[in-house]
Design a protein with these regions (language model features):
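Long, hydrophobic N-terminal alpha-helical segment
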Residues: 1-39
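Glycine-rich active-site loops that engage anionic ligands at enzyme catalytic sites
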Residues: 25-31, 35-104
Length: 104
């Protein structure tokens, strides 16, 4: 048997920049996919861009607060999507540390 799963992709537009992201196969990613398109104002926290959404999702078992460059996170307690690209005010050394555990 051959199963084919097409990876879902979406585009995040921030001013004159476009970021195409591949969504993981998670409940949170599916929730985001079903809510597209939506708009929000961006905010900065150190070297993190985040924007609020109207989405509600529970914290997933593999949620984490330290991410790798290029990972997109959903912050359930803040109802926001975060894109960390460098140090935040609470980072230690060169890590990308988010304010709280987030779904990746």
């Amino acid at each position: 048997m051959l199963n084919y799963y097409m990876q879902k992709k979406c585009k995040i537009c921030i001013k004159n920049h476009e970021i195409v992201v591949s969504l993981k196969n998670t409940a949170t990613a599916e929730l985001i996919w079903k809510s597209l398109p939506f708009s929000s104002d961006i905010n900065l926290w150190g070297e993190e861009v985040y924007f609020y959404t109207n989405l509600s999702s529970e914290l997933e078992d593999d949620a984490k607060d330290i991410i790798s460059f290029g990972e997109i996170a959903y912050w359930p307690s803040g109802k926001a999507i975060a894109i960390g690209y460098g140090k935040t005010p609470i980072s230690r050394s060169s890590e990308i540390r988010l304010a709280d555990k987030c779904n990746i």
